[in-house]
From Swiss-Prot:
This is Probable transcriptional regulator SLK3. It is found in: Nucleus. GO terms for biological process: cell differentiation; flower development. PANTHER family: LIM DOMAIN-BINDING PROTEIN (PTHR10378). Belongs to the adn1/SEU family. It comes from Arabidopsis thaliana. Residues 447-459, 512-524, 544-588, 611-636, 645-658 have a biased composition (Polar residues). One of its GO terms (cellular component) is nucleus. Its main location: nucleus. Keywords: Developmental protein, Differentiation, Flowering, Nucleus, Transcription, Transcription regulation. Residues 39-56, 460-471, 525-543 have a biased composition (Low complexity). Coiled coil: none annotated. Disruption phenotype: No visible phenotype under normal growth conditions. It holds the Pfam family LIM_bind.
Length: 685
């Protein structure tokens, strides 16, 4: 541990008011230091020493001595040139330490050019080419480095943050005697960033009073958390840049004479954004009062901005000790000891007669008086249980109140209203913004769940079409039950999933029938569809899924559809009576009953209102639903089997059913929305 006041090696300004960062030797302001032994020697000895160094460093060079091109180049430099260059550098350092003399710079540049020419003459052509490539690569890297580094960001040097902290502590100690607020405002402006925050954590204290929780003890655990110890107890304070000057002024006005900081070896890091962090695992802060001292141990972390200003000051206190001066307590202890000795002598002198009541009373009063006086000296009235001045903690609490009301103050100032009216309007505005944010989050969640369930259901539909007849029939019945339960429950996730599934089926129909002949779309009575032997009975179930999920029409429309389901005459010619004896007719009857039950339950629940608002093209979808219902019931009453949508990928040219007309109308209704035109949602179907 080293004491922070030991900063003899720093270039500290003499005046406390001269706030300047020039005392820190940054890389931009550093100069080349000449050798101290060279500066004190006479010129003749310097010349001889330089000649000896030049003789030792110069190695004769021959072209035939190169065995590889990649070896480092050894140059034949004349002793006169080397001596002249070193003399020029010494002259530059002596006359102009900052290196701003143009004449000396020109001479040095000429010397470098001449050396470069000599080096090129002594090289072979291959070596010259390699040197040119290296120079070009070096220039490119330098240009990239200058582009990446901001002009305001200084080059990083190890220890620069620690030196800045030493400067901070020096000016903190060398304050004026009058403790004026003007000095502290300049102090804060010099060492703190306008976005700076100073945090004090007291979470590791075992027993602290309610004053450690600030003005809002119930809300403090949810609003305040320490990043050093990781606890969220709410025991701590935070001060912003606006109140730092007043806070420091009150600290030294509350009886603190000096503030010392004992620091361990720091851990210094630099982040890619230019911020620098200085962390001390063990830091001891000592506040000196007139009659006592408070020693506090904790964890300190300071974050500096790229311009070396404090952006964050965090101190997590572990424990503290209150040290009293011995010279102040010793007289009171001696007085108490004398009173005790007097009582002992009184008892011994009384002998067998005993001590009189008057002597006992007088001795008791003397003991009590000495004890009270000692307790008075040991009692620290200006401090609280945390070892901080009470006025200082009270100021921190007030600053938190001001910070919480800052939004209200700005709102009343901008809108020119009073405090009560401003508070009312601000609460209404905050509630509106919060409600809108919740709605946006719900919409995003529904969209994500719908986008995830749409492709999954599409994959299930495509895989179910390749199964056998009986298996497909059972799967379609189970799928109808699942869809019916989801629609009856009315959950937003189920609604979004059904909507995406419906749009996927519409898109499949549009792709299957886009090449079909539109002139043959007059009705079922004039057509004789050719059935594919590979068609699955699950096609009717998929059509009924489209009916169950297409738009959720209103109650009168549902009743009309139920009437169509119950009493629609056969619209298909009975050209294939043998199809009525199909083994899958029983499964289709069960599907028809399930669909009828589903429509009744949806009518009773009245879940169609929200879906009518969600789909603008509702009338077209209702008409299409009615047509699809008529077509699906014809398989039971009339006998013509409807081709499967999945198998129509293989026989799209032979599919002359009137579904293309219905789908074209629906596709026109939904084509205005970009959501249904995005092929990426459905995996390129």
């Amino acid at each position: 541990m080293q004491r922070s006041s030991g900063i003899n090696n720093l270039h500290i300004p003499t005046s406390p008011m001269s706030f300047s960062s020039n005392g820190i030797n940054l890389p931009g302001s550093m100069v080349l230091d000449g050798s101290p032994s060279m500066q004190h020697l006479p010129q003749q000895q310097q010349r001889q020493l330089l000649e000896q160094q030049a003789g030792q460093g110069s190695v004769p060079m021959r072209e035939n001595s190169y065995s590889h091109v990649d070896k480092k180049l050894r140059l034949e430099v004349k002793q006169e040139d080397l001596l002249q260059q070193q003399i020029l550098q010494q002259l530059i350092q002596r006359q102009d330490p900052t290196g701003r003399n143009p004449q000396m710079q020109a001479l040095l540049q000429q010397q470098r050019v001449r050396q470069h020419q000599q080096m090129l003459q002594s090289m072979s052509p291959s070596q010259r080419l390699q040197l040119q490539k290296q120079q070009q690569l070096r220039q490119q890297l330098q240009q990239q480095g200058t582009q990446q580094i901001s002009p305001n960001v200084r080059p990083y040097e190890v220890g620069v943050c620690a030196r800045k902290l030493m400067m901070y502590l020096y000016h903190l100690q060398q304050r004026p005697a009058e403790n004026c607020i003007t000095y502290w405002r300049k102090f804060v402006a010099e060492y703190f960033s306008p976005r700076a925050k100073q945090r004090l954590c007291l979470s590791q204290y075992e027993s602290v009073g309610h004053h450690a929780l600030g003005m809002f003890p119930q809300a403090a655990p949810d609003m305040w958390q320490c990043d050093l110890c990781g606890t969220k107890s709410g025991k701590g304070f935070e001060a912003t840049f606006d109140v730092l000057a007043r806070l420091i002024e009150i600290k030294f006005a509350s009886g603190i004479i000096d503030e010392l900081l004992y620091l361990d070896h720091p851990r210094e890091n630099r982040f890619p954004n230019g911020l620098m962090m200085l962390e001390y695992r063990k830091a001891v802060q000592e506040t000196v009062h007139e009659q006592f001292r408070v020693v506090r141990e904790g964890h300190l972390r300071i974050i500096f901005s790229p311009d070396l200003k404090i952006l964050s000051w965090e101190f997590c206190a572990r424990r503290h000790e209150e040290l009293l001066l011995r010279r102040l307590i010793a007289p009171q202890v001696n007085q108490l000891l004398q009173v005790a000795q007097k009582c002992q002598s009184t008892i011994s002198e009384s002998g067998s007669q005993g001590v009189s009541q008057q002597d006992i009373q007088s001795n008791s009063n003397m003991v009590l008086g000495a004890g009270r006086q000692l307790a008075k000296f040991m009692e620290l009235q200006s401090l609280n249980d945390l070892g901080y001045p009470k006025r200082y903690i009270r100021t921190l609490q007030i600053s938190e109140v001001v910070k919480s009301m800052k939004d209200l103050m700005n709102f009343t100032g901008e809108h020119k209203v009073g405090p009560l009216e401003g508070l009312k309007q601000l609460l209404e505005q905050t509630a509106t913004v919060k409600l809108q944010r919740q709605k946006m989050q719900e919409m995003e969640q529904f969209g994500n769940s719908g986008a995830m369930s749409g492709p999954a259901q599409a994959q299930m539909t495509l895989s179910s079409g390749t199964m056998s007849g009986s298996t497909a029939n059972n799967n379609s019945n189970n799928h109808h039950q699942i869809v019916g339960r989801g629609a009856m429950n009315g959950s937003p996730q189920a609604t979004a999933a059904l909507t995406n599934y419906q749009s996927m089926l519409i898109r499949q129909n549009a792709m299957n029938n886009q090449n079909s002949n539109t002139g043959n779309q007059e009705g079922f009575s004039s057509q004789n569809p050719t059935l594919n032997s590979n068609q699955s009975p699950s096609s009717s179930s998929q059509q009924r899924e489209n009916l169950a999920t297409s738009g959720f029409p209103s109650s009168p429309q549902m009743q009309q559809q139920q009437h169509i389901l119950n009493g629609t005459p056969n619209m298909l010619p009975q050209n294939h009576p043998h199809q009525l004896q199909s083994p899958h007719s029983h499964g289709n009857t069960q599907e028809q009953q399930m669909l009828h039950q589903l429509l009744q339950e949806m009518t009773e629940n009245g879940a169609s209102v929200e879906q009518q608002q969600a789909f603008p093209g509702q009338s077209g979808s209702n008409n299409n639903t009615e047509r699809n219902t008529t077509a699906s019931t014809s398989n039971i009453s009339g006998g013509g089997r409807v081709p499967s949508r999945i198998n129509s990928f293989k026989a799209s040219s032979n599919n002359n059913l009137p579904f293309s007309e219905d789908i074209s109308v629906t596709d026109h209704d939904f084509s205005e929305d970009g959501f249904f035109n995005n092929s990426d949602i459905y995996g390129g179907l």
